[in-house]
Amino acid sequence: MTAPGRRSSTFSRLLRHGFTDPSAAERLLESAELEPVKADPVLLEALGATADPDLALLGLVRLVEAQDDHTARRELLDTLIAAKPLRDRLLGVLGASAALADHLARHPRDWQALVTYEPRDLHPGVEEFERGLAEAADPVSLRVAYRRCLLSIAARDVCGTTDLAQTAAELADLATATLRAALLIARTAAPDDAAICRLAVIAMGKCGGHELNYVSDVDVIFVGEPANGADEGKAVQAATRLASHMMRICSETTVEGTIWPVDANLRPEGRNGPLVRTLSSHLAYYQRWAKTWEFQALLKARPVAGDIGLGEEYVATLAPLVWQAAERDNFVADVQKMRRRVVANIPAAEIERELKLGPGGLRDVEFAVQLLQLVHGRADASLRSGTTLDALKALAAGGYVGRADAVQLDEAYRFLRTMEHRIQLFRLRRTHLVPEDDADLRRIGRSLGLRADPITDLNREWKRHATVVRRLHEKLFYRPLLDAVAQLAPGEARLSPNAARERLVALGYADPAAALRHLEALASGVTRKAAIQRTLLPVLLGWFADSADPDAGLLNFRKVSDALGKTPWYLRLLRDEGAAAENLARVLSAGRLAPDLLMRAPEAVALLGDGDGGRGGLEPRGRAQLEQEVLAAVGRAGGSEQAVTTVRGVRRRELFRTAARDIVSSYGTEETPAEADQGALVDLVGGAVSDLTAATLAGTLRAVVREGWGDTLPTRFAVVGMGRFGGYELGYGSDADVLFVHEPREGVDEQEAARAANAVVSEMRRLLQIPSADPPLLIDADLRPEGKSGPTVRTLTSYEAYYRRWSLVWESQALLRAEFVAGDEELGQRFIELIDPFRYPAEGLGDDAVREIRRLKARMEAERLPRGADPTLHTKLGRGGLSDVEWTVQLLQLQHGWVEPGLRTTRTRPALAAACAAGLLTGEDAAILDEAWVLATRVRNAVMLVRGRAGDTFPSDGRELAAVGRYLGYGPGHVGDMLDDYRRITRRARAVVDEQFYGA
């Protein structure tokens, strides 16, 4: 009996060596079977190095016990202690695989397969495995020989002698040898059938890809042809019998279990189709009936057994069809849909443990790689590998996948596949579910070298790699670049000059010669930059062609690329961020404004990357965030000119952000449809530009005051937005209509205060109009009391006196849009409180005031509409245009604002909605006016985006007019429809205006 002290010492040593049940382990060590070696410390050390020391010890005892006699047991134990390579391999297998331990217990002499380890055995291939299976003459002996070969693969794997790729390749080679052995058994059993047919076995899936798992269905396709002049029908029948027998030999369960199922369901028509077809029958099916996924499956087709010549002919015949698959309608969408369907079919209880099929799993990597291969492999034969890791390496070498992304995907795939191998190796069962039992997780973690805290570390590493796969899979697999590339003719994924010229003509480029020069400048050369450009250009050309001016799009792309081409992140952004390339294409070809803004600061391209639907970087920033940025910049600047230069730079960047968001939302992308709510886009642009203008004025005001007076101006000073500015409805080229109000600080002379206030206004105007690369901001104060004849700045008291005594009805109407925007907020709010009684007069407007407003409106229509302008197409002063709608709404505000709080807003659309809610307009009339106002505003925004300068009517230039149409959602050739729709919508609005405003 073991002394307590000794037991305690052994118990502790076992714990230190990783045993989870030291008591049971101690009993096994004390067993008679291990008596000759139990005192040798190398045994305990070797057991402690295994994935599961308890399991390895139990397996060793069973193996020793199973030896035929004492001599055999002594040979095993002596070799175990003397030969470290055997000790590591044997105990490594026993600690990782209960199934292989069972095999060794049934076949106790098979441990000797792990003794010989000559250098040539480090990487055995099909021939070596065929020799290992050569003596197997029946299904049972084939299984035993197969397991013996599997022992050597598993031993090299768990000891780290081979990596994941080599292990998977060896498993595929063993499968190949096994299929050949099984077919030989079948042919031997039916020599007459063998004599009249040629039968080729084509490996598919992971076996075909030379990347098999320990336990996996072996996917195959059979091709049969007559031999020796035999009848084709009889030959196919004979080949079918041989194929069926071969499948049974591998798949059926015997006293030695099974090897793996042979699955022929990837054949034409699946399980409903004939098991064996002739080559011509295969070709006819794929030419006429095959679905997209069937071509994807053929990526991995590889002849492995039977008539290899026939198999190679099969692969060569079908290969062209594989590389034409990307031309099929909806090819990319079909592949993506199939992947999503696989995920959707995973039981909810299993999805978090699905190592293969779940999000971030192995299939995500495989699908992404295969899709990229099918799209780009048409023009690049280097991508045509059936092995995932080899294909990924080739994709990275060709510039189709970022190098860093490829490294991360490779690492993640290797980890997840190795984890899958360890899970399957334990019981030699086909599974992709990560076990939940701690003992299983501990064994897997230790087998992967995670010894400190195996369970926690395994879960952390697994989730980390799955997260990487999910992120990169979404970038690579779902990036909309592929859809467009997949629709190009073969050979155009990377353009040759001749193909480019033909493509340019077909796409309608007005100057193909100039466009080709741009392409040659962008795509020529052997640099990585040029390779990536060649990949992007076919896609971009198609997107440019969707616009009204593809030549401008390509020219602008060249300008941006010349400016940023040496910047590492630029091409990486376009290639890897799904939204960026298409967003850039839309922006560069939609007109002059956005490209002009971008050319002045090309780094703003970074805003076009992925986010919420590809628009996350384009979401306009709020006023508070903008003011914080500009005020901080002013604080850092050395003087007012430098400060305002920085502020104007921010304004330029944010104008680009808003314009790009507007364009992308108006055009839509491959992933995200065009914004259906046109009013929402109008509100977005108006609010964003108004917030930006307010922040610009705030920063400029701060810079001027700091330069001239330090921290404190002698008078409190506020800027009040008017017109579209006060209504949050500014367009891209709008001036800033404002009023300036000041109030002398205590003890400051009024004249001194007035001089300071006027000096501030003059300096703000000067700084915002200094010629520079940034667009100027014009300040217009003509809506002030007495107009251009009145003082530019007034005190609060002066404003109050004027409005009480002299104010005309049009001035009360103008005040409906007054809103504090910059400067002293308390003073600004007091000004708003001051004017409320004038813009929302108690008891509303009298009849005389209503008649005066109507008279003013009629005179404006008659006098201000430009000579020769079409009144049906003028967005501001034309029939049913902006002025019509706004004056109608404002009349209701003047009449009813005093009793209807909802009408007390500076914004047209909310006021219109409030008038409807108050019963002042019917829902139909309100909708008609809203539709016309939104459309007219959209047209004005479009004109500015297209021409780069403001305009109130549709362009006369045909290409510019078409560009406005594309922005509004009208396709090529539908400019006439756009004008007809505009006239129809505004005509209906004018009818409402006549009734509501003029009382007709």
Curated annotation (Swiss-Prot):
Chemical reaction(s) catalysed: [glutamine synthetase]-O(4)-(5'-adenylyl)-L-tyrosine + phosphate = [glutamine synthetase]-L-tyrosine + ADP; [glutamine synthetase]-L-tyrosine + ATP = [glutamine synthetase]-O(4)-(5'-adenylyl)-L-tyrosine + diphosphate
Listed cofactors: Mg(2+)
CDD domains: NT_GlnE_GlnD_like
KW Transferase (keyword) present: yes
Pfam families for the chain: GlnD_UR_UTase (PF08335), GlnE (PF03710)
Region spans: Adenylyl transferase: 487-1000
One cellular-component annotation, GO: cytosol
Annotated keywords: ATP-binding, Magnesium, Multifunctional enzyme, Nucleotide-binding, Nucleotidyltransferase, Transferase
Molecular function terms, GO-annotated: [glutamate-ammonia-ligase] adenylyltransferase activity; [glutamine synthetase]-adenylyl-L-tyrosine phosphorylase activity; ATP binding; magnesium ion binding
Uppermost EC category: transferase
NCBIfam families listed in its UniProt record: PRK14109.1 (NF010707)
HAMAP family reported in the protein's UniProt record: GlnE
Function: Involved in the regulation of glutamine synthetase GlnA, a key enzyme in the process to assimilate ammonia. When cellular nitrogen levels are high, the C-terminal adenylyl transferase (AT) inactivates GlnA by covalent transfer of an adenylyl group from ATP to specific tyrosine residue of GlnA, thus reducing its activity. Conversely, when nitrogen levels are low, the N-terminal adenylyl removase (AR) activates GlnA by removing the adenylyl group by phosphorolysis, increasing its activity.
Similarity annotation: Belongs to the GlnE family.
UniProt protein name: Bifunctional glutamine synthetase adenylyltransferase/adenylyl-removing enzyme
The species this protein was found in: Streptomyces avermitilis (strain ATCC 31267 / DSM 46492 / JCM 5070 / NBRC 14893 / NCIMB 12804 / NRRL 8165 / MA-4680)
